[in-house]
Amino acid sequence: MPLKPLALSLQWGRFDAAAAQRSALPRHLIRRWIRHALTTDAEITVRIVGADEGRQLNRTYRNKDYATNVLTFVYSQAPLVTADLLLCAPVIEREAQQQGKHLQAHYAHMLVHGTLHAQGWDHEGSADADAMQARETQIMQALGFADPYARQPG
């Protein structure tokens, strides 16, 4: 299946490890990971933030007083997906370490996950969660990554 066109805007919040994260996440990889998850044309802004901004936005928009790995804000879906994906760098880094995953692999997974949300996928019920996880695994493996839901050794 051909990759869909993507207008990508990439923003970096102010946080301690922003420079290191930026060098580990070149724009062309972010674009590639998102495009593999798209089934329609898209305009997506990716903003990578620190814990304070991530917590504030999660509290404001989801009434949850903690920073989470990815938030998806959808403005339109087919025929053109328009969305913002907010990734919280410290949460993603901590999760990657805890799960024994390479940092880029976990970022790719969170971008795929958020992009699927932008297209209407969710994981509210167990059937939806199973379907979404299967799709994420398929995309991640097509990108050359391991199944993100496989148990890590150790």
Curated annotation (Swiss-Prot):
Question: Coding gene?
Answer: ybeY
Q: What does this protein do?
A: Single strand-specific metallo-endoribonuclease involved in late-stage 70S ribosome quality control and in maturation of the 3' terminus of the 16S rRNA.
What protein family is recorded? Answer: Belongs to the endoribonuclease YbeY family.
The EC number of this protein is: 3.1.-.-
According to the UniProt record, one GO cellular component term is: cytoplasm
Q: Where, per UniProt, does this protein localize?
A: Cytoplasm
Which prosthetic group or cofactor does it need? Answer: Zn(2+)
- Look at the named UniProt entry and state the broad enzyme category this protein falls under: hydrolase
* Residues that hold Zn(2+) according to the record: 113, 117, 123
> One GO molecular-function annotation for this sequence?
RNA endonuclease activity
Protein name per UniProt:
Endoribonuclease YbeY
